[in-house]
Amino acid sequence: MKLAYWMYAGPAHIGTLRVASSFKNVHGIMHAPLGDDYFNVMRSMLERERNFTPVTASVVDRHVLARGSQEKVVDNITRKDEEENPDLIVLTPTCTSSILQEDLENFVERASLSTQGDVLLADVNHYRVNELQAADRTLDQIVQFYIQKARKNGDLLEEKTAKPSVNIIGVSTLGFHNQHDCTELKRLMADLGIEVNEVIPEGASVHNLKRLPQAWFNLIPYREIGHMSAHYLEKEFGMPFVDITPMGVVETARCIRKIQEVLNAQGADVNYEEYIENQTLHVSQAAWFSRSIDCQNLTGKKAVVYGDNTHAAAMTKILAREMGIHVVWAGTYCKYDQEWFRKEVSEYCDEVLINEDHGAIGDAIARVEPSAIFGTQMERHVGKRLNIPCGVIAAPIHIQDFPIGYKPFLGYEGTNQVADLVYNSFTLGMEDHLLEIFGGHDTKEVITKGISADSDLGWSADGQAELNKIPGFVRGKVKRNTEKFARERNITEITAEVLYAAKEAVGA
């Protein structure tokens, strides 16, 4: 077991609550000690919604530890059922309260005897899985529960819609640009003449889950959430699914061609080639931009990519294939699905990194000194310390990644957003130099280029002054070489003389 003060993917109960609070009229109850109950605050702060987060903490305190939880948990479930009238209540422990080894399944059965709505215990092993795996499993559990319930009641709708239709599975609260992606996917489906049957879990009613089998196919835009549900629906009803993330011009076209293949296999007669060509050449600016002089200035520049599987893989392909940028390494924190990631990106980058230790990722960035980083909020912090620009492409995210304006990452409008993000992330040619000349950023001190906080070197006033005379675009490199030179010779304070000596040593 390892103590972590930064996690890329949160604990399992966060994933369960993300799915529960994405549905309409579903209430989540977490059986948790104080400290594990931060989901409400986090969601209320980040998601730009007017409604309260439908999650209640059933707090594990000293009274519970003395008497057991049954009475309190059952009371909380029945009280919330009376107050909110939810269609479904999802109970989840946290990894901390799981230690108590209580029979929560029994509590749920007891509570459901006196509730109007359904009650479910999240079927998740809190020690074995993280937020993303738990979200996928909880969505699958809820889908299965309501499909089986409809089957039992005899009101399961299995007859296909007259026109081609789709279920979009995996759009959830607190996802990276998920709301905007969903809007863009709906537009894309409308352009292709495909009706959207259901979007789950975001904004969906659990009573509509019985309508899922009516769609012609399922679209899984994100690798992390929705796969288990898609496999279940395929097994039960023979429903095909498309799991190509339409991010970037090439992958969007590949996704549309796969949809065409799936529809034509079911008796439709569609041809989307003209649409793909029109969008690529005339509507999406990304294809034109990648041939422009602006983008050609980026050719061969070094970048690193890190994030969840979906976004890191898609971004690596866009940079390497569509923009000619040299991806030195691509990494993911989704260790549980690393085989897929390796297969997707290995031909587009020099090195594949599977690691969830933010310190190791920071050191890997410092080691290769890229021109730009594409990662999570943590890599943005690393970039600030290293004075390397960073574009955020994946969760974990902060309030600025929930923009008010329309910024999808998927579909053809998404290609424009990604192109902007890439171009704006690289420092423009004369920018640093002009800032130096006109005295911009004059409060900015040159900071260490190591991430691990073990630097034992100091710069004297004359050494710092001499360093500041060096143009910004090479200053970082000179500073690192000088510090390396000083460490090798056990020098603790770097003066102007040490800087000159280091320069000579490198020159020699």
UniProtKB/Swiss-Prot annotation:
Pathway membership: Porphyrin-containing compound metabolism; chlorophyll biosynthesis (light-independent)
InterPro entries xref list: ChlB/BchB/BchZ, LI-POR_suB-like_C, Nase/OxRdtase_comp1, P-CP_red_C, Protochl_reductB, Protochlorophyllide_Rdtase
Annotated keywords: 4Fe-4S, ATP-binding, Chlorophyll biosynthesis, Iron, Iron-sulfur, Metal-binding, Nucleotide-binding, Oxidoreductase, Photosynthesis
Residues where substrate binds: G429, M430
Reactions mediated catalytically: chlorophyllide a + oxidized 2[4Fe-4S]-[ferredoxin] + 2 ADP + 2 phosphate = protochlorophyllide a + reduced 2[4Fe-4S]-[ferredoxin] + 2 ATP + 2 H2O
Cofactor(s) essential for the protein: [4Fe-4S] cluster
Entry note: cofactor: Binds 1 [4Fe-4S] cluster per heterodimer. The cluster is bound at the heterodimer interface by residues from both subunits.
Positions contributing to [4Fe-4S] cluster binding: D36
Positions of the catalytic residues: D294 (proton donor)
One example of a Gene Ontology biological process annotation: light-independent chlorophyll biosynthetic process
Record function comment: Component of the dark-operative protochlorophyllide reductase (DPOR) that uses Mg-ATP and reduced ferredoxin to reduce ring D of protochlorophyllide (Pchlide) to form chlorophyllide a (Chlide). This reaction is light-independent. The NB-protein (ChlN-ChlB) is the catalytic component of the complex.
Assembly, per entry: Protochlorophyllide reductase is composed of three subunits; ChlL, ChlN and ChlB. Forms a heterotetramer of two ChlB and two ChlN subunits.
Family stated for the protein in its record: Belongs to the ChlB/BchB/BchZ family.
Name of the protein described by the UniProt record: Light-independent protochlorophyllide reductase subunit B
Species: Acaryochloris marina (strain MBIC 11017)
Source organism phylogeny: Bacteria, Bacillati, Cyanobacteriota, Cyanophyceae, Acaryochloridales
